[in-house]
Each structure stands twice: as structure tokens, then as C-alpha cells.
Amino acid sequence: MFKNNFNARPVALHFKHFTHRSYALFSCLGREVLICTLSVATLTNAKADGISTKPVASALALDSLSREEVKLDEVLVTGSRAPLTALQSAKIVAVISRDDIQRAEAASVNDILKLVPGVDVRQRGGFGVQTDISINGGTFDQITILLNGMNISSAQTGHNAADFPVSLSDIERIEVLEGASARVFGSSAFSGAINIVTRADAENNVTVAAEGGSFGTFGGDASVNLATGAVRQKLSGGYTQSDGGTENSDFRRRRAYYTGSWKSRYVDMQWQGGFSSQDFGASTFYSAKFKNQFEATRRFLASAQAEIKPWTDDRFVLTPMVYWHKDVDHYQLIKGKEGAAAGENYHRLDTYGGSLNAHASWLLGKTAAGVDVRREHILSTAYGDVQPEDKWVAISGTDRKYNRLGERTNTSLFLEHNVIVGGFTLSAGLLANRNTALDGKFRLYPGVDVSYRPNDEWKVYASWNRALRVPTYTDLYTSNSVQQGDIALRPEKNEAFKVGTRYRTHGFEAVLSGFYSKGTDIIDWVYPTAESKKYQAMNIGKLDNMGYSVDAALHLQELLPKFFITRIKAGYAFIHQKHSTDGDVFGSLYALEYLRHKATLQVDHRIWRQLTASWALRWQERMNGYHPYTKVDVRLQWSAPTYNIYVKADNITNHHYYDLGNVKQPGIWVMAGASVKLKF
């Protein structure tokens, strides 16, 4: 039976922020920042005095140098609506630093996330084409994805959430927060959140990169970084194409991204804009019955935010933000066949909104309050309510018209207070959420996070949070020969508990965590009877996810500077599900297919002079008929101040495996490339 499922497993993740009140971007969204394996890199898009803008000897360099010199107690994090330092924060977030990204054998953000034990990445195509990402046993629709604090998740479907307009070279760090976080990020943070933080250098430079390899794959990237006074700007673009590693998996990807920042005594500003485009053969991505599917997606986004500080001591900070993103999707059930009868659909989703966050420090702690209003508007040939003919909208490039419309407004009100006494932190907050797609009433989602730090090495923490997710337009309106949505679906609800501890000392750090998530009215695509031929979107009842994870890193370059191995990093996660329902469920497509076990191992070592190697091993076992598999990747790299040359191989054992349904993944994929960076 064809299974196209998606799930994530438990793992300790950590969000991290930068020093100084400098990351309004995160403060604005009340992001959760945390420090975990290896990074004290700051969390900001591009702040004039943020760590990401400082010279090589600063925080980023410290990721690969001496951690002991990092003043963790000075680093502000956003595990709460009011920014707290890393030591004060009651949250732990997993941070994938720029140094980690540069060493990894990775072609996309999705490849990087595969190395986080608690993240489940189910890939359909190479280079991150059509990827489902989930956390802690949830599904791909249950996480919030942010770019510099801007929520870029899609109300249409989570399948296209990973269409990022940035390349790996644009990224300062990736932060992963696991567990329900509605009171910080809003109702869409049902099982976790991922924030991608970009960078802009403090110097003028131009970077050009190119690569090529297996399956006719080639591509290139270029960027320009400008720093003038208090203004920092970066513009980048890239193109990649490939014949794909399996039948009908060819693709072409284009992207462009711009980010900037400006800083003054009382006001800091950050802004960004981006575009991504993908055209790809969709093989059997959505149905095993059709092997010649095709899809093309386009994404446009923009945001701007300010950090207003009436007093220089940051006793009160106001952070407004406005944002917009458009997602355009063209799908053909059979490549080249046009028309609704042939299974061709068009969708255009516009999401826009604004937020305002304020936080104040006073005698009894730190208090934060905020509001976010988000409007989602979809035009489609398949999703939404049928419109009168005089309201149909022409579709560019075809004689068809959008004849359906869906729209809803999501309003979130936030309130939080933080108490810090010695090594003890208590952070309690409340989200009041109203969505016009429901009954128009405000619903309350509280949360409490507690941590205790007996000394600089140890930290223990516990949390309890609630969240809700409304169905996507795909869940509600899909209707074709193999799938049927349901406009009567109820929203999902989640109550999550998490406990854990972190230990960090010179040359070593580890995080151990456990979680229990109680889900009700969980949405999945299932066969309602054993004889069913069509998957149906249903509320499948109660689904409890429980598990634990451990993530540890040994930084041998700090303990044994002359030893050829510089770092060893290992992680393991286990998850168990308990499902109960009043009716029968057969053939789960997503929610009941989860990673029971996942283990990761990374080893970095020197070879000769500037020549280094990075190895990554991943073993995982998925439930419901999937065979366990082991995958090994390697990257050889020669690094110099102005250039970088590398050869990387994905799946060096040439093992054929399946992440999702019967979508076969490629064997060994070898790429070689180089980049040059010139200052001016």
C-alpha cells in the first residue's frame, strides 16, 4: 500500500540569540532562543553590533575555536516574548551554527536539519525539492518555519514550506525549538518551530560559487555585501538544475534574496525580501498510481521591522513588524496534460500581516505584551468556496481562471511575565487566539517554563504548553480520484510536557530531554475502511507522542589541539505513539508513520594543512512497513581566506532507501565545487 507519511521524533532543540537587545526580529516574534551544541553565534539577521557582524575573532569564530571565552551570560536569547540571556532562559533550543553548516555535506537547509536527532525530514526529491519537515512525532503541517523571525509557513500546505529563498551561504545559523510554543510564536507552533537566521558581513565583499556533479547537476551562487556606516546590506542569487537521481525527478531552482539593517541610538531596523522558484518532475510524490506528475512553485516574501528604544538601558523596547509572502503553485497529475479533468490545478496564496511586541524591565522582573494579526487569502481552481463567474480571476500564462476563494484572519494576543532569582527562572505566559475560520471566539493557550542553574555547567528545565492548529486549505478542500478533504474538520489541539538537562564544560556539552505530547482531534489522511481506495482527511482521535533524546558534542580541538580529530558529535532519539479513536483507521498517510529510532554521528578531522574532512552517519527506523537504513555522507574541503574548494558525496554506500511512500531516493550523488570571496 502506498504510504506518504510524515512524522518527527523527540529531541532537544535550542534556539539561540545574539548579544545585546539587538535582535528585535526575534524579540518581535517572541522567538525562543537557546544554546546547545556548539554555538554561541548570535541570533540576528544583521545588526550593526550583533555578533554576526563582528570580525572573525568574535562569536562565530568561537564556534570553531575556544568556547570557554564565550560569555554565555551576556548572550540574549528569545525563548520568551521578553529577551533573556542564555543562562537565564528557561528554554533550551538546538542551534546549528554557521561553522556546522560549512563543514556538513549538505545541499540544502533540509540536509542540515537531518542531523538534528529530533527532526524528521522526509524528502521526495534531491537538493531539498519537495520536503516534509516535522518535530517530536508531529506532522509537516504542525510546525512554524521562520526566516529571521518572519513566519513563512503556508496555509495551503506544509509540503512547500521548505521553499527557502536563501542558500546555505546566506545563513548565520538555524535554530530548532521542539514542543508546543503557541504562547511565543502563535497557534501554528503546534509541535515546534524552526528559525533560519541570515547574515550580512561588516565589510564590503563579493562571493561567487559554482558546483557540478552526478545526474547532470550544476549550479552557481553569487552575493554582494555592502557595509556603509550604520547600514549593512546583502544581495544574493542562485540557480541549480539537475536531471534528478531517479525517474521523473529532474528540477530547476532559482532564488534571490536581499537583507539589510540600519542602527541608530534609539531605533534599529531590519528588512528583507526574497524570491524562490522550483520546477520539478514530481514522480510519484502524491500518488503511487501516477508516475509522471509535475509541479512548479513560486514564493515571494518581504518584511520590515524596527526596534524602538526610548531609553538606552533597554528598560522598555517596542518592536513593530510588517510582513507579506505570496505562494504560487501549479500542479499537473500527468505532466503536460492541461485542464481540471486531467488533474491540473493552480493556487495563489497571499499572506500578510503585522505585529507589535513590547517588553519592559522593572522591579518584579520582565513583562512582555504583543499582538499579531495575520490575513490568509487563497485563489484556486480546487481550494476554497466556488465563486460567481463574474468574480473569477485570470491566471497568468493560461486561459484558465481562479474560480474558488478562501480567506481567514488570525489574531493573536500575547502576555508574559518572567521572574529571575539567582539561578532560577520562571517564565509564564498566555496566548489569546481568534481565527475567523472557526467560530470567531478567542481561545486561551497558556504555557509555563521553568529552569534552574546550580552552577555554570548544569541547567535543568521543565515546561508545559498548549497549542491549536486549524486545518490547511489542502485538508479542507482537496477532492480528486485518490484524496478527499473535509470542510468539517475540527482544529487539532495539543498539550505538551517537556523536561531535560544540559551540561557544558570545556570541550564537552550534552543535552538530555524527554517529552510527552497529548494530541486530540489530530488530522491525518487515512483509509476509513479496509476496502477504501481513496485517502480521506479525518480527525483520527487522540494521539499521544512520548520519547526522549540525547545530543552530545566532544570538541577535541579544545582538549587536544594537535590531535587530527577536531570534533565528534552524536545524537539519538526515541519516540513511542499511543493512538485511540472511536472509529477504525487504516493506511495512515502521515501522523501514524513516525521515526521510532534515529541516531546520528558526525566526525570532523584534519588531513593535511588546510585540507579537512567531515563525515556524517544517520541511521533511522520508521514505523508502518519501512525498512531501517543507514546513510553515510562525506565532505573533503580545502579552505583558505579567500577561496574554498570541496568534493562531497551523499550516500557513499549507494544504498537505495525510501523516506516517504514508494518515492525511491537516489544512490550515491557526488558534487565538486569552489567559491571565491573578494573584499573591496
Per-range role (PLM):
Residues 322, 364, 397-519, 565-566, ...:
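Structural signature of Gram-negative outer-membrane beta-barrels, strongest in the C-terminal barrel
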Residues 192-193, 198-226, 235-249, 292:
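Short strand-turn segments of transmembrane beta-barrel domains in outer membranes
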Residues 71-102, 132, 140:
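N-terminal periplasmic "start-of-domain" segments of outer-membrane beta-barrel proteins
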Residues 242-253, 268-318, 322-351:
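Flexible loop and strand-edge segments within Gram-negative outer membrane beta-barrel domains
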Residues 132, 151-178, 196-199:
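Short acidic/polar hinge/loop motifs at secondary-structure boundaries
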Residues 110, 114-150, 154:
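Extracytoplasmic beta-strand/coil segments of soluble accessory domains associated
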Residues 420-425, 516-518, 539-622, 675:
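Gram-negative outer-membrane beta-barrel transporters
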Residues 287-311, 347-349, 439, 459, ...:
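Outer-membrane beta-barrel signature, preferentially recognizing the C-terminal barrel domain
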